[in-house]
Amino acid sequence: MKLSKYIDHTLLKPQATEKDILKLIEEAKTYDFASVCVNPSWVKLAYENLKDTNVKVCTVVGFPLGATSIASKVYETKVAIEDGADEIDMVIAVGQLKSGNDEYVKEEIKKIVEASKDKLVKVIIETCLLTEEEKVKACTLSKEAGADYVKTSTGFSTGGAKPEDIKLMREAVGKDMGVKASGGIHTREEMEVMIENGATRIGASCGVELVK
């Protein structure tokens, strides 16, 4: 697979303007990235500009804290898909996981997988807030709930992707599930290290620099 197809070209800053999003979309088309990842209010715009291409539209749910209710996340998912999203990056309820409420976490992922129908679901576990044991548990619950990917980070918390976390997550989910590294990846070397450790998708705001 060519390097560009690993990349979710990402712009999730709250101050991003329509002009910024359109630039992101044009870059994704030029460099043939896997997707653009944008906030839900920009999904329609992204869909309209990418529907005749093979670049997917990715958006976020329960972002960035993961602390909204399951019902809220399900509704967000349904609206995003109606607006044209192909991929959903959802944030788990980190506090519920850390409280040992495994069934809650599994249920919310399962509900979002169901709401997404045949669309891709990536589960953001926010590795920087978890112990090693919790990281493995989050990955296991994601797999059991039927998600397609586990993802390291929102990029809005205390840390981003680390190679050792990618390796741990890959070992936890096995070969038949995607692993997305996101947060703090700024160079091609960093991206290649993530891929070597098991990442099958890279979330980055500097996608153009990574493939030039």
Swiss-Prot record:
Organism listed in the record: Clostridium botulinum (strain Loch Maree / Type A3)
Name of the protein in question: Deoxyribose-phosphate aldolase
Membrane-spanning intervals of the chain: none
Lineage start: Bacteria, Bacillati, Bacillota, Clostridia, Eubacteriales
Catalysed reaction equations from the record: 2-deoxy-D-ribose 5-phosphate = D-glyceraldehyde 3-phosphate + acetaldehyde
The organism's place on the tree of life at top rank: Bacteria
Pathway note: Carbohydrate degradation; 2-deoxy-D-ribose 1-phosphate degradation; D-glyceraldehyde 3-phosphate and acetaldehyde from 2-deoxy-alpha-D-ribose 1-phosphate: step 2/2
UniProt KW Cell inner membrane keyword: no
Keywords on record: Cytoplasm, Lyase, Schiff base
Subcellular localization(s) per the UniProt record: Cytoplasm
Pfam families, alphabetized: DeoC
